[in-house]
Amino acid sequence: MAITAVRRGVRRQSRVRVRVRGLTRPRGRGRRGALLGAALALLAAGAVAGPPARAAEGAPLWFDGRTATEVSADGIRFTDGHGREVVLRGFNVSGETKLEENGGLPFADAADARASATALRSLTGGNAVRFLLSWAHAEPEPGKVDTGYLDRATEQITALLDAGLRVFPDFHQDLFSRHLFHKDSWYTGDGAPRWAVEAGGYPVESCGVCVLWGQNITQNQAVKNATRDFWTNRVLTVGTSGGVRSVPVQDAFLDTAQKTMAHLAGRLTEDRFAGIVGFDPYNEPYAGEYATGQNSRTWERDTLWPFYERFRARMDLAGWRDKPLFAEPNMFWNSNLDLARQEGGLLDAGALGKRYVFNTHFYDQKAISGVFMWGKAKDGQYTGDLGTVRDRAEALDTPAIVSEFGHPLSGYTSDKAPTVDKAMYQALDTRLPGSTWWTQPARSGPVLSAAQWQWDIYSGRHREAMNGNSDKILTAADAWNDEDLSAVALDSSGRAVLRQDARLLDRLYPGAVAGRTLAFSYEDRSRDAGTVLTWNRVPATMPSTARLVGDGRYGVLVWRSEGATRAPTQLHLPSGFTPSSATVVSDLGTVTGPPDYTASGRTADHPIASALEPGTTDARRLLLSAPAAADGAGTLHYALVADGSAAPSAELRASAQRELAAWVAGAGFPVAP
């Protein structure tokens, strides 16, 4: 999961019932607090296959479908086939893959995958997921890929694609492999198959005085040795049905990855395959042990990056040439504990271009520890941390994605979760704290793509025999090393419901922008217990705008047209931003209750309209269409979107429009790249 060394509410009820095995499983609480140990260790060391969205009269929307769904890297941003800037937002699906109960897959079957995807789209408006895969299950015997496992994975990915979600698969590992751990161990891992561990001849796993599971990364000699052997491509002697073979362990992994990717490419239709964004080769890479004279930076340069180049070549051979590799640096490169941070961030990789994406995780190790940060997160808490992610992506000339972030939802630091997660989403949206966003919006920066850890519909209902021990059946929370981070669970009737404030998770965000985003901020008014968290207040110098927003939720987007597409700018509308009451104030006009989108050919009948999200029956999006005559390259556009907590008059909307126009004109936004 995420920075494994340290880490790790409801919108309207989903009407979808999620069919799941074991609905009567007990909700045991189990042991908690497996997160502080990692800190100690560090210090010690448009939709594809689903039916297209339709206009009011029933005709398909012209800009949806494969062209909208297909995503590529374009400089420091993702773009779709229309040339619109794309933001990917969603969840990891899911930590269930790290368990054995569903055979190394996120779901018991495709039906559960469909129900989970529908709930994710309905309850959060997410448009992308990181889909976890297991090397151990893909290659249970050396050189023999389990096509049945890959078929089941393909079926589950298909269900997600058909719900309008984009997918990037991830061969996941934590602590290298569960097969390193004996049946009575306090800890477990996931990743490599049994044969690779048995052939390695590793010492009996022991973390010594470890308090929590993350310490195994730097203190468990078995984990360190196995990880080191993977990166050095140690040749293992393994027994097979055809006799004894010599198997370089990294080569075996690359062979399996290539066959997995080829399997997916061959069994997904072309339209569905368009929804596959790329591939994440290896979760949270770390050397295990550095060679003599080696450090974190030289390890990235001489070991990790050549691995990515080898994986990139396998992607090309498997039919993934046009999809980027999601390259993650040394997992400790952006630790927010100074004594734990290691130099890295692919500093010596040069410009990556469209063949790669800068892929990183971020967790507040200080907050998770319960020792290094007292109190709650505050406005702007992580803008510097995620600003560093933006800076590295710009230096690498590639898009960035934060493919894991989050905070525990139970345990002695869980009271921090509402503020920590709000501050993380804030920093994904903008470089600026709310206190300075209105006065310095030109410094806001690009909106980051991200996937929260995690989305597991079986949360609290597992039945996992830890390390194969039938006397240690785990049911509570994530059923994995005492973690509890799933944003979703099933209620007593089997419906998927959010475990965190829906105002936090169901967010306004720019899914597709016809041009380049210059500034974005969303005030979600999420709650910390009974306290409303308001970090971005409209300034007193804009009284009409402040009055229009009131105490409701609102977001502001400023973008610069590049004159290259007539496809509309698209923002997800959270629950409560209903078509009948949401208010939009923009240079394109003002409206309360945007009408359904209709068009004459490719010309929108209304510059401000709404429509269903592709692949859904209740999630909606706002569509902003600038008339061609007023949308030349370099034209600045803006839109304030409020949730309709009050019904503003046309006069108030017009006054707010004048204030916003003056604010944009005086903010110093560039009109050219």
Give the predicted meaning of each segment.
Residues 1-55:
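Secretory targeting and sorting signals
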Residues 49-55, 257, 326, 449, ...:
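Signal peptide processing junction and immediate N-terminal pro/mature segment
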Residues 53-59, 673:
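Low-complexity, acidic Ser/Thr/Pro-rich repeat tracts that form intrinsically disordered stalk/linker regions
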Residues 64-79, 85-88, 92-334:
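Active-site mouth of glycoside hydrolases
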Residues 69, 240-446:
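Extracellular glycoside hydrolase catalytic/binding regions
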Residues 138-142, 176-179, 335-336, 368, ...:
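Extracytoplasmic/secreted cell-surface and envelope-processing proteins
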Residues 346-353, 359, 412-585, 614-672:
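Aromatic-rich peripheral "rim/lid" segments of glycoside hydrolase catalytic domains that contact
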Residues 586-617:
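Solvent-exposed beta-strand/loop surfaces of large extracellular or lumenal domains
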